[in-house]
């Protein structure tokens, strides 16, 4: 029998939670009963998300932090009593043709999408394994990857590199954290109707090319991704680890 997702008494941390997918995931986890910790660089955005979560009678703590600031993130984790779920979501993209990629853009994407993702996952894992009954209660880490962690795409070589790296990290982490009953998976969305994608879609030619590459013929919605994340966070996914949940409308099936 299918059980309704219940994350009561679980503490979930979501990075990049000020808008887009992070915001959607934070609200969905709170609606499922989790105590949610939201992190973003922009305090006004966090305050808006906090209000939305409290409207659902959910529990929420907010911290303004750039996840590339390792020491600041470590200090935040010291203030948290326990952690059961991590949604490692913070990331960005700066599309450029490979031959014209600016050094500063490449370094920025590697710093955020790879190094910060690694550091956040490591620091949170260290916190999670310290819980005495961790093996009994389990834990879940969800790395927000992309369909472009599985296939290439024009003008996205650096983004490809960072997301392929995150896919590899997900599998390595899954093997090493399994003994603590901490599951590690990634969610790989196609283009999702977020503020960032809406900006890209101002280019009508690009939007047409994207839709032609999605067999279902439509971009994903934020709710499609937050539902996948909530599923992986819950007991319903107890035997799922070291894999990727594709939310890509069939893009990578071709």
State what each model feature region is:
Residues 2-3, 151, 230, 241-254:
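Short C-terminal tail/terminal secondary-structure segment
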Residues 99, 151-157, 179-180, 217, ...:
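Active-site loop immediately N-terminal to the catalytic Tyr-X3-Lys motif
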Residues 146:
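Residue(s) in the substrate-gating loop at a strand-loop-helix junction
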Residues 97-98, 102-110, 210:
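Substrate-binding pocket helix/loop in short-chain dehydrogenase/reductase
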Residues 11, 18-20:
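Conserved glycine-rich cofactor-binding loop
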Residues 178, 183, 240-242:
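Short, small/polar-rich loop/turn modules that mediate ligand/substrate recognition or access, typified
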Residues 121, 162, 170:
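Active-site helix of classical SDR
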């Amino acid at each position: 029998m299918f059980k309704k997702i219940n994350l009561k008494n679980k503490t979930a941390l979501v990075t990049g939670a000020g808008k887009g997918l992070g915001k959607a995931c934070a609200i969905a986890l709170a609606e499922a009963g989790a105590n949610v910790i939201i992190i973003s660089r922009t305090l006004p955005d966090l305050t808006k998300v906090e209000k939305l979560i409290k409207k659902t009678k959910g529990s929420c703590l907010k911290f303004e932090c750039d996840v590339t600031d390792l020491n600041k993130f470590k200090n935040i984790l010291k203030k948290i009593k326990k952690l059961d779920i991590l949604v490692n979501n913070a990331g960005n993209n700066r599309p450029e043709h490979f031959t014209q990629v600016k050094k500063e853009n490449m370094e920025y994407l590697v710093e955020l999408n790879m190094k910060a993702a690694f550091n956040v996952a490591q620091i949170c894992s260290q916190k999670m394994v310290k819980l005495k009954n961790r093996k009994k209660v389990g834990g879940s880490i969800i790395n927000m990857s992309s369909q472009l962690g599985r296939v290439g795409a024009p003008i996205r070589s650096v983004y490809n590199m960072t997301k392929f790296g995150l896919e590899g990290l997900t599998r390595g982490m899954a093997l090493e954290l399994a003994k603590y009953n901490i599951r590690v998976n990634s969610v790989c969305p196609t283009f999702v109707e977020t503020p960032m994608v809406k900006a890209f879609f101002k280019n009508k030619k690009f939007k047409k090319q994207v839709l032609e590459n999605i067999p279902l013929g439509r971009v994903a919605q934020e709710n499609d991704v937050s539902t996948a994340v909530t599923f992986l966070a819950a007991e319903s996914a107890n035997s799922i680890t070291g894999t990727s949940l594709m939310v890509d409308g069939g893009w990578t099936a071709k």
